Each structure stands twice: as structure tokens, then as C-alpha cells.
Amino acid sequence: MAPLIIGHRGASAAAPENTIAAFREAIAVGADGIEFDVRLTRDGVPVVIHDRSLHRTARLPHRIADLTWSELQPLDQTVPSLDELLTLFESNKLLMYLEIKCDSAAERLPLVEASCKLINQHSLKEQVIVGCFDLPTLKVVRQIDPEIKTAASFELAISTASPLSDQRILAQAVSVDASAVALHYRLARKRLVEKAKLAGLWVAVWTVDDPTWIERARALGIDALITNDPAAMLAAR
């Protein structure tokens, strides 16, 4: 079965990442879903941005956690709110992969509560998967709303002396009752994918822009590929 194609931060190869323009482009080229990152402003508004500060995307020194939503408004469409994003695309029946970004334990509960509230307000439980690299955050999602699907995200271990084994990855995902795993492409080993599927986990792989991954994903049984260039990946599918 062909994998779903999910636009990483929208169609970020064609438009600025995590902007409405990037998400519209992903939809225009036929992506099956969009992936985006969510952080919390100082006044508790979930906004769509990957980095903790505006330095890379807007060349400004401010941290998102130090700004209010109104203070972000002059940036035009650079940083949309989660509410705005869900409002615009709730009728598209897209898969929405919402990656929670929190820099401290203190941010965890308010960010998860605010995000889950909006998911419910927009009646998007069937379309949204909430992912995070921080496993305790996924536990909080489950506690707040057990019906919202979650994905345990895994990147390559920083230390090669302690690589992430298949057993460790699956054990961590199961420990937080995750619905899915999102694997760095170098972790997408045949045995791991097979074990994840046997455990009933949905499997996504990130971030891949090489069209040869389409056939690899089909052969391995990978459910979705997260890509910066959904147009190129869809052309190969």
C-alpha cells in the first residue's frame, strides 16, 4: 500500500515553513496531510512555529514564550495561531500531525490543555495526531483526552555509544500508550517497522525528500512519509 504523504511544516520546500502559505501549497499539490509545530505564547495562545525564538524564521531575537499573541501580530502570516490553522483547514479532511514543542515541564500542561481544547472545539479528533519527542508530554495528552491519537517521536541518539534499539523504541512508545511512532528515516529499519506494526502502531518516517522512499515505504509497510517536498513525493507515488 502506498504511504500517505505529509507536508513537513507544510510544503516547506516551496514556501516559508509553518506558514499558511506553506500549508495551502501542500494542500494544492495534493498532500494527504500536514505536519506542524505548536508552542505557547506568554498569554497562553498556541501558535504554529518550530523554534523557541523568532531568530531563524523572522530574524528577530524574541522568544515565543516571552511574547503575547498580539505582539506577534505585526509579523503578518509568519506565525499563525493554532486556532487559525484549524479553522482554515478543518473542512479539508486532511491528516494533521501536531508536534508539541515545550522547553520546560512548566509549559507542558498549559500547552497540551490549550491544544486539546482547540482540537475538540473544531471536532478534529479523527484527523489529528499529537506527536512529541518528550514522552511525559504524551502522557499528559492521554490524561486530558484519551481519545486523541498520539505519536511518540524518535530521533537518532546523540551518543553512538547508546543507540536507540528497536526494543527500547517500542517499549517507550508502549509505555505512554502511543497510537503511533514517528521515526527519523535512519531508524526506519525493517525489523523495527515490522515490530511496530505487530504492536498495532501507525508508523511515520521523517524527513524524507528522496522519491525512492516511496517504494521503500511500500515494501516496509510504512504508513506515512513526512516530507518538505510533497509535490515531488506525490509525483513518484
Per-range role (PLM):
Residues 1-237:
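Phosphate-group recognition and catalysis centered on beta-loop-alpha active-site segments
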